[in-house]
Amino acid sequence: MKEKDKPIGIFDSGVGGLTVVKEVIRHLPNESIIYLGDTARVPYGIKSPETVIKYSRQNTNFLKERGIKLLVAACNTSSAVSLSILREETDISVIGVIEPGARAAVRNTKTGNIGVIGTEATIKSGAYEKAINQWSVVSGQWSGKKIEVASKACPMFVPLAEEGWFENEVAEMTAEVYLSDFRGKRIDVLVLGCTHYPLLKKTIQKSVGTGVILIDSAEETAKEIEILLRERGLLSDGKSRFVDFYVTDNPERFSKVGKAFLGENGLSRLSAVDLSNY
């Protein structure tokens, strides 16, 4: 198989990474994709850094064995904790979801007040604050000015997304508890720092108000994938395109939630896999 026709490998702790898959399909409809959702061990956000690194390595080994041309860590927790390690240990390009989201936040803020929500591990790592502040200097947009980043861990959003509870009363009440603090901070941009969170986008937007721009790291990541593949001459012509999905537990539940935003036939090629030997 030609290098450009090899699939893109994408992994996440569960269904959240399907938000990245959806955006990759929208931006790059000719590309083949292999997706791995580690549903047996979701969520990653409450695990220790050592455990997240172990899981991320196993996910990477599984996808590399299937001949991918690019690896996407479509999990903010994995991106925050293990991305640099995966890049050191892997001989193919590795893209995370934090850097694209941080760059988009800096581009879109007018006040310099940016909010970030994510899992406990992502927020504790400070990865978004670091990336936002670095990019604000590199871009020159906020040179000499200080960007204020307000962060909040929202761990219950992940199980809500995994259950498919995107817009019901429970989701709205949970969002209100988590996000009410942002109203006094006068943010004009809120980064959805977990790939599960775009599934709750309408509920989150309702809570923070229409005056706050929501940054979807999934969409920004898909744009960066397109740029990288184009620069390296690795865009596929789509002649042998396929999209395969693997999960580590409960494929029926994964399929039910996944179909809610990928469509009825979006997960037709779905299999269960054991990662213990990876």
Name the predicted role of every residue range:
Residues 1-278:
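Non-catalytic structural scaffold of enzyme domains
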